[in-house]
Amino acid sequence: STVDLQFLGIDQEKDVEGLMDKITCLAAPFAPLDGMNDAGVSCGIYMTYQGGDETIPTDVDTDKPDLTSTTMLRLILDYADSVEEAGELVKQYDMHDSANTSYHYMVADASGKSAILEWTCGTDKTDNDGSARTLNVIYNDDDGRIGEREGASDFQWITNFVLQPGYYGGDDEKAGLDRYDRIYEELAATDGVLPDVNAAMDILKIVGRRDWNNDDGNGCTV
């Protein structure tokens, strides 16, 4: 898995030298932003800006055990051997988004199966109670409800807006929609099958936030 140490309060421009920083690094395995395990299950996290004018983190409060964004990824990487197992694991917990913002997640496995995990309640304009959200799992073989091109494709892709049908009104902003469209164009050109890891990295470079000509301010994104 990969971990951004700045999310743990460590200056990424300096070496880890102080005792407290070294102790903090012991927690790094539990703060992944993406990763893949030995069974071929991979997962990643992406900001979604849910809550209308003010982003509201998911904060589900039932009688289930609690889980944060990054510890959920750690759970999947440690214990899931397939997308289905990942989904069943996550359903056993209450989600509490990290860093005071909201996210959705994508999981894939070696069989080609994938799923997008989203916690929502109502529409973008009314989704302002993080405790009222429920988990929705969108599998790649059952995503025609999202849109025509999604239903016609065997692959999934994701950026920074919620994919649940009807979540946004006609005038609501969908963060990352332009990059979402570009990723689709690149993947559709080869029916979602890329020759090697370099080809995948090339697509990520095309839509990377540092080089993309817009005003995106997100940190957890494609």
List each language-model region with its residue ranges.
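Short, basic/low-complexity N-terminal boundary segments at the transition from targeting/disordered tails
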Residues: T2-L19, Y79-L89, V197-R210
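Stable alpha-helical elements in mature extracytoplasmic
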Residues: P32, M36-C43, S69-L73, S82, ...
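Intrinsically disordered, low-complexity linker/loop segments enriched in Gly/Pro
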Residues: G51-S102
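C-terminus-biased signal that marks the final domain/tail of proteins
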Residues: E85-L89, S98-S102, A110-G112, R145-V222
